[in-house]
């Protein structure tokens, strides 16, 4: 039920490098569509629903709010509904000085997130961090920045989502998994971007090695590998 539009947020060619936002070019808008479609889809999966009912068991600790109050079972369920409820978002591209900017209806991310999100370990931290600002969470919660538990486990919303993405991507259970479909990172599309591509994302083999490394480190992957969902047919 999200209503999404795009904006330059006042950017013009004359504003200078210190401006908070960059031009919202079509190539970035297309990636936003992929990002939002995958994110919304993740929220409908059996794995998502299971983790939200068993968060501490799967992820090693609970989510907590701006007052550092851990979520109750009821809070997990009510937030599940709130996150997918009707809301307006204005999407943009932020300055490289930030990973992103978000709050209210504004949801902006920086250039590397537009091509990094396919790799799971890159992109989703900023994407979901800013989403949670739109959902009224601040930096005192672990909804924007994950935080270490006393046992040393990094727990938070951003950790959950990149791990869910890497699990579903490996299964082929996401609407969009192929970064070559739009080819944002490809040299022939450089003329349509206003950014360079980080070295790690320029070679498919190198990128896959990094994805595999993060896959092996994921608590969520380990949990569902050892405890497959009975109603999960894929």
Can you name each region flagged by the protein language model?
Residues 1-124, 134-234:
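Predominantly extracellular/secreted Zn2+-dependent metalloproteases
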